[in-house]
């Protein structure tokens, strides 16, 4: 449930929080929602463009696997650091300004990565890329939560669906359609983003602030916040593991080509998009607790199907079902963490963002280590366990529907 405190209903407070041309006029409503959705789309698009270009970067600089691992660790460190600082920057400089800067810096850093004339410039670009990604991840969720607080209770899952759509677009732009010309493609990507952003980003919500912006150690003793963090971590472990290992699993088991092996992740992503687009309405209809329980069960059933169905079509159906099950977990966790009465919105979002991003990073190597010992198929049983844990954890979520207070 999205809890809205009484102050958000006060006319004077609403006017202060929502800029002119914001969500109180019909054209402004559409433009504000579109602007925030475009942020999520950019995030998925640029992240996928980078991920599919990693082999090119490795070959261009002759990195070995260990050096590439260090490189990704440096990028992750920058992301985690600026995730932690994003709330502070938003508090000091304003949400709209920082959201715009991070959203434009992210694709700009991608151009610098491909155009870097030497290794030192490349390393600086990687740090900048990670920092922009981390800050943008937190800030765009601030904007999403602000929309929920200003009359759009069914929006978080849809916005995360826009991110998944961006991921598909990034895979198509940089992974499927040819090879080479990375600088030209990244510049074209940045130019398109700048053109659309010039029109949309002035309509982002401004002054999205929430009092305390520092994560105090004492707040980590909050059991519900810790639970949200653990669930965010496990959910993103699964996302990272499927992104990395689903293709290899199908290639090994079904003896298919690289292109055909990619269909597993495509099926996963397509059903995730479908689930997120409809997720807010489903949550409104059946309640948060029921949706979490169903999602965890679908995820476990999907991974079980993908592992044990003998046919290739059956395995694809399993990955699709897994994507449907995973679709609404992150949006709900983020929304609930930002709605807690015992910690500020900024602290809740920052904590679950850091936990989730950490899970996405460590998920593939965790599965890889387990696979070395017991085989990839058995290692992926871990994802079935994640679904069971999520379904059991549904009892800690409110059972009420959106807009209905918990009795």
Swiss-Prot record:
Transmembrane segments: 31-51, 69-89, 109-129, 157-177, 186-206, 225-245, 255-275, 290-310, 316-336, 347-367, 377-397
Signal sequence segment: none
Subcellular location: Cell membrane
MF annotations from Gene Ontology: transmembrane transporter activity
UniProt keyword annotations, A-Z: Cell membrane, Membrane, Transmembrane, Transmembrane helix, Transport
Start and end residues of each stretch annotated as Disordered: 1-24
Keyword set includes RNA-binding: no
A cellular component term, taken from the record's GO annotations: plasma membrane
Principal subcellular localisation of the protein: membrane
Protein task: May be a membrane transport protein that could either transport a precursor for rhizopine biosynthesis into bacteroids or the finished product from the bacteroids.
Full protein name: Membrane protein MosC
């Amino acid at each position: 449930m999205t809890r809205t405190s009484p102050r958000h209903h006060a006319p004077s407070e609403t006017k202060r929080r929502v800029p002119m041309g914001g969500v109180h006029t019909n054209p402004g409503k559409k433009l504000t929602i579109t602007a925030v959705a475009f942020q999520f789309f950019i995030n998925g698009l640029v992240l996928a463009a980078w991920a599919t270009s990693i082999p090119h970067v490795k070959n261009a600089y002759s990195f070995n696997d260990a050096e590439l691992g260090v490189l990704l660790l440096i990028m992750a460190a920058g992301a985690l650091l600026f995730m932690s600082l994003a709330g502070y920057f938003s508090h000091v400089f304003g949400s709209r300004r920082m959201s715009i800067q991070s959203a434009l810096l992210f694709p700009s850093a991608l151009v610098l990565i491909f155009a870097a004339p030497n290794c030192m410039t490349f390393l600086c670009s990687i740090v900048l890329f990670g920092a922009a990604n981390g800050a943008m991840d937190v800030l765009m969720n601030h904007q999403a939560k602000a929309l929920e607080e200003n009359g759009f209770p069914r929006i978080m899952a849809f916005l995360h669906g826009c991110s998944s759509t961006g991921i598909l677009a990034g895979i198509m732009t940089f992974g499927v359609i040819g090879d080479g010309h990375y600088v030209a493609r990244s510049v074209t990507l940045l130019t398109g983003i700048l053109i659309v952003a010039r029109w949309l980003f002035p309509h982002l919500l401004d002054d999205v602030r929430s009092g305390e912006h520092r994560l105090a150690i004492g707040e980590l003793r909050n059991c519900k916040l810790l639970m949200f963090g653990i669930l965010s971590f496990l959910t993103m472990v699964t996302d990272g593991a499927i992104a990395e290992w689903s293709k290899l699993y199908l290639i090994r088991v079904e003896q298919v080509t690289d292109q055909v092996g990619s269909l597993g992740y495509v099926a996963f992503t397509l059903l995730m998009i479908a689930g997120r687009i409809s997720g807010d309405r489903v949550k409104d209809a059946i309640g948060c607790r029921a949706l979490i329980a169903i999602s965890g069960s679908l995820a476990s059933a999907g991974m079980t199907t993908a592992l044990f169905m003998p046919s290739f079509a059956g395995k694809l159906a399993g990955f699709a079902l897994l994507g449907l099950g995973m679709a609404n977990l992150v949006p709900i966790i983020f929304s609930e963490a930002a709605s807690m009465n015992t910690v500020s919105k900024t602290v809740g979002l920052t904590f679950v963002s850091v936990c989730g991003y950490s899970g996405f990073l460590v998920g593939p190597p965790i599965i890889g280590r387990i696979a070395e010992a017991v085989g990839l198929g058995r290692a992926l049983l871990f994802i079935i366990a994640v679904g069971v844990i999520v379904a059991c954890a549904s009892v800690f979520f409110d059972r009420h529907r959106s807009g209905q207070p918990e009795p």
